[in-house]
Amino acid sequence: MVKKRIYELAKELGISSERVIEIAKKYDFKVTNHMSALDENEQNKIRGSISLKAKKKEHIQHNKNKDNFHSKKVQKSNTGSKDENNHKNVHKNNRKRSGSSMKENNNAKNGQRNNRNNRSNNKFKNKRNNNNKRNNNFKKGNPVPPRKNKPLPETLVYTVGMNVADIAKKIHREPAEIIKKLFMMGVMVNQNQSLDKDTIELLAADYGINAEEKVEVDVSDIDKFFEEEQNNTEHLEKRPPVVTIMGHVDHGKTTLLDKLRHTHVTEGEAGGITQHIGAYQVRHDDKIITFLDTPGHAAFTNMRARGADITDITVLVVAADDGVMPQTIEAINHAKAAGVPIIVAVNKIDKPGANPNHVMEQLTEYELIPESWGGDTIFVEISAKFGKNLDELLDMILLEAEMLELHANPNQRGAGSVIEARLDKGKGSVASLLVQQGTLHVGDPIVVGNTFGRVRTMVDARGYDIKKATPATPVEITGLNEVPDSGDRFITFEDEKTARAAGEKRAERALLKERSQTNHVTLDNLFDTLKEGELKEVGVIIKADVQGSVEALAQSFKKIDVEGVRVNIIHQAVGAINESDVTLAEASNAIIVGFNVRPTPLAKQQAESDNVDIRLHRVIYKAIDEIETAMKGMLEPEYQEKITGQVEIRQTYKVSKLGTIGGGYVIDGYIRRDSGVRVIRDGIVIYEGKLASLKRFKDDVKEVKQGYECGLMIEKYNDIKVGDQIEAYIMEEVPVD
């Protein structure tokens, strides 16, 4: 017995599933919805019922046509008698008119008086009669033209989550009709409710059309697009190499680049040290080389951390008189970690104490062995100051680039990375980009990191306006809504609407990610964190001047136990607090305790930016008490006063039920709505309290800066006078040393 579902039988018979269910229920078949199955006998009965009804319908239609034909004949024969009756009626009407003419003459005067009223009444009557005529047309059964549905499409292209209203538009049907169908299927929805994949496909099957799912591409995933563009191997062409110059401070990196591009960067920079990242191009033997000039290795590392591996070759500059220095080793490690080939430029060979061989010996310890010694590292002895052997260095760079076989497709959409970015007062957001794939054009909609916009202007490395930039070309663009981060990737889109949607979505995700990040523990928030159950142990890094102090602190901390929460010593060592300690504390959410030691300037700066808590002590028991007290929630923060601004009262206004309003001018700093204030008259503090309100014109504001006027009221004080000085201050928390 071949069973068939109701919706399949309905499709075969060319009727709706509801109609089949209705017939099936008349025969007492056990059916519930369009998915119910029918056996062969049940199917035949339904088919028979449909065919019988079709015959009846045909018979009725035939009889109806007969009746219509007969009625038309009758109407024709009656037309003659109607004409005779009309002729008689004309004579009767003429007699009536002659008899009534006398009455009309007598009433003429009265008619003139009531003429005005009659006009208005006639208008009302005509309007009412017209409405009645319309209503009578419907009452008489005049046929209303039926609404014609557009034909169903062959395929319904849908996305998961579409609502009934969207589907109705796609298949040219009313939402009410679809809701009714879904109700018959046992699905209760309204027109704005999202539908899942199965429901949409069942609905399409019920209408007898195909369903095709359209998978939506996440336009905000620019990393995916970037990789697709990178992996596109069609129409590849040779591109210039991108070279980064690295090395120890004052070993001549910028001087070398200055000589290579024939400009004077060094003279214009403070102390001869590079102050920003730049990208420049040099032409040698009719070939172009792109150089990146970094202010330090941190920028290189940050770019790598963001996935921007933009460098093809690293030129390691080592001074022949100084040899290998700490930053030289750091540069080697960064280049090796990035998997970038290294060319060593031994600089300052013109100096009296220069010893290039000693440099080569030192670098062998770091697996950089010269080709002349049987290795594979290119060494070039140069003098950046006098321009000696620079052509040879460029030749070696081009040779290395040839070995790397660098290619890109300029015929696809532009993609690349941010070298640097800044906010310019006149231009707005300005970003230096390196095009890595495709071609970037002026006017292209673009997404850069979590920002978006349209390329408004584009300037090359020489400062000239250009219309397009091909692979390995550094450019400076304007037109972004915000300033991106160095190392961010960029990609262009076909239209600005898509670019905006992608940029806004990325910015939203970044904000959510930032909010969801773990707050670093400090002694001030330690008790609250423990109370919330977020922390089961307190991580501590101990640094002291001698080993004995380190061990004494470690042993004492281990003995602290507050409500089952213990102290975990993550790291302990002798010496100053350095960047590595801060990085470890940031990663492990720990507190740094220093005893008779201080943090290095860089470590202090990093701790402030990473929100890592450093506590410095000279007495051991105070350090122990501080940790224990913080864990018990009894540590009181210390505050100090900070003067933020001064306001001069130039006019006063008395307002009933409110008090005295002082019209002032901010002569220094700023005043905030939440600031504490002092009223100073002739150098004497008259009153100290808080602001009740702060306004600019009629608007309440949070802050008024120097050079602007404001209106203010002080809580519980109405004796403000012209000439008074209002001193604004805030209380800042002081870190415990």
UniProtKB/Swiss-Prot annotation:
Coiled coil: none annotated. Residues 383-385 are annotated as: G5. Residues 238-407 form the tr-type G domain. Gene3D superfamilies: 1.10.10.2480, P-loop containing nucleotide triphosphate hydrolases, Translation factors, Translation initiation factor IF- 2, domain 3. Residues 347-350 are annotated as: G4. Residues 247-254 are annotated as: G1. GO terms for molecular function: GTP binding; GTPase activity; translation initiation factor activity. Belongs to the TRAFAC class translation factor GTPase superfamily. Classic translation factor GTPase family. IF-2 subfamily. This is Translation initiation factor IF-2.
